[in-house]
Amino acid sequence: TALAGLVEKGAAYVLEEGKVTRYTPVAPEEFCTNKIDRLQEIKQKVLSQLPVLKSDAEGYITIKGELEIINKLKNTVRQAEARIYVSANKRVMELLKSELVDALNRGLKVVIISDKQFTLPQAICYGTEKQNEQIRLIADSQTVVTGDLEDEENSTCLYSCKRNLVDLFKDALKNEIKLIELQKGDNRG
């Protein structure tokens, strides 16, 4: 029966065996925890059987689709070991917020260029007007992710560990910060 199938999948328990079998649902929190635990076990098994990659690809990798781009940004922040520089609008920053907070808690330097309304305690924040969906992220002066999320599922970004591209974007972010600081000075006078 359908209820027996739910028992096999871990979504229900059998209350009594006998002439009449009764079922009770597993609490949603418990069911989800069980499934997540099982996925973690599968993840560890798969990872233990995969060959170890020496480093990220040396070339330029194109990532397509908003969800995949956000996932790459989050994973790049999670894998950073020293510092993160990110330039994006408030909407994108909110999507990265928990990973950035975690990075700060790990002692990483986090520099943010975003809308004036977005702030993150302990991070160095530069407020400006960011109306487009353009994103730029540099991690550990070794990795760059850049592109835009304007076209949602048709959005694309570039991921690379190429030194020349990383240096180019470091200079671009430094210049953006200098421009923000100059504009602040103009607003005061």
How would you label these PLM feature ranges?
Residues 11-37:
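Short, cationic-aromatic polyanion-contact patches
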